[in-house]
Amino acid sequence: MRRLPTREVVDMKMVVAVIRPEKLECVKKALEERGFVGMTVTEVKGRGEQKGIRLQFRGREVEVDLLQKTKVEVVVSDDAVDEVVEAIVSSARTGKFGDGRIFVIPVEKSVKIRTGDEEV
């Protein structure tokens, strides 16, 4: 692997947002409008404080304890974290239980698979 020459070490963070699936397009648009186009999107299941929901299915009540969610991951420089978080919150919030959660995680390095270039 070759390490790219850097003028300065840039602290990077991964912003991980677990959101309602129907809010994905709004979140993508909000991020793109602010210049953040790279992201990884995964369909996931989970639960938080709401602990699932009860639904009617073929006349019977069914408890669903893991709900469909969408996970959006964006890696940005440390100084862009607040802008990314604000974009996600403002575009994904409904004000109801189940809106999701955002996590900010340190990233130690990034390696481009095609070239082997490493950023620290």
Curated annotation (Swiss-Prot):
The keyword ATP-binding applies. Its main location: cytoplasm. ADP binds at residues 40, 48-50, 75, 98-101. 2-oxoglutarate binds at residues 48-52, 69, 98. The keyword Cell wall biogenesis/degradation does not apply. Keywords: ATP-binding, Cytoplasm, Nucleotide-binding. GO terms for molecular function: ATP binding; enzyme regulator activity. It comes from the Archaea. GO terms for biological process: regulation of nitrogen utilization. One of its GO terms (cellular component) is cytosol. It is found in: Cytoplasm. ATP binds at residues 40, 48-50, 75, 98-101. Activity is influenced by intracellular pools of the effector molecules ATP, ADP and 2-oxoglutarate. It senses the cellular nitrogen status through 2-oxoglutarate, and the energy level of the cell by binding both ATP and ADP with different affinities. ATP and 2-oxoglutarate prohibit binding to Amt3. ADP promotes the complex formation. Undergoes conformational changes upon binding of effector molecules. Homotrimer. Interacts and forms a complex with Amt3. Involved in the regulation of nitrogen metabolism. Regulates the activity of its targets by protein-protein interaction in response to the nitrogen status of the cell. Regulates the activity of the ammonia channel Amt3 via direct interaction. Belongs to the P(II) protein family. This is Nitrogen regulatory protein GlnK3. The gene is glnK3.
